Amino acid sequence: MKILFTFPGQGAQRPNMLAAIPDREAILSQARAVLGDEVETLDSADALKHTRAVQLCLLIAGVAWARELQRQGVNPQMVSGLSIGAFPAAVIAGALDFASALRLVALRGDLMEQAYPEGYGLTAIMGLTRQRLEALMQGHEVYLANLNAETQIVIAGRDEAMAEVAQLALQAGASKAQRLAVSVPSHCALLDKPAATLAKAFANLALTRPQCAYLSGSTARVLWEPQQIADDLAMNMARTVHWQEAMVAADERDARLA
């Protein structure tokens, strides 16, 4: 059996989430060297209203907790991250250094928030299949964002359009429709331009071949080539997350959660 480390996306954040991370002073010192004094209030409730802070907190926390597992002798043979979680996954795999990840994630958060400062986001729909949900989405400015499970799907778009589709979904038998704590329409074509800008930032950065399998949450494929991983990291904000397929792919490779 192989050990799999997974890293969450936005929605997993909470105030003071960096207060109890392992080896806190050392990792925050590394973050401070890149980000400056911003680190001191990064996980405050006010800061977490912004995409940049949320994504940086998830990166820092993900790396800290994974490194703690490694210190205890638990080393992954495979890593995978959902959305922003792909960045700590790449760091732990050895494909991307932590300092570069901090700079890239800060830019990623800024680009996403600047593109859609308000009025857009994500909504989770539970209890309907993709086929049934897509039929309800017709004529509404919404997109499939995350295919997390057979009947757990996230849509992206304008708040009003998502609310309309959510109501239709509930009327059609969905068990739940929940607006997520994400303020940008991630994982759809609305973020094509910010993703292209982020890709340019990777142009002058040399990633390295990972030391363990890097499983893309977007394509559900294991990537080994540094350029493919760079493309995955840069563009995943504009690509549908195929998390269910990724976890099936991990299972087929005999990988299990640590």
Language model: regions and residue ranges:
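Alpha/beta catalytic cores of group-transfer enzymes, especially the acyltransferase/condensing modules
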Residues: 11, 37, 93-238
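Flexible, low-complexity segments
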Residues: 61-79, 235-258
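A short small-residue
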Residues: 40-48, 88, 176-180
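Short, glycine/charge-rich beta-strand/loop segments that flank catalytic centers
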Residues: 45-46, 80-84, 109, 120-124
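Short phosphate-binding/catalytic loops that engage adenosine nucleotides
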Residues: 3, 74, 174-175, 255
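Gly/Ala-rich beta-loop-alpha elbow adjacent to hydrolase catalytic centers
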Residues: 62, 77, 81-85, 89, ...
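A broad detector of short, well-ordered amphipathic alpha-helices
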Residues: 29-30, 60, 64, 86, ...
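Helix-rich "cap/lid" substructures immediately adjacent to catalytic or cofactor-binding pockets
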Residues: 1-80, 155
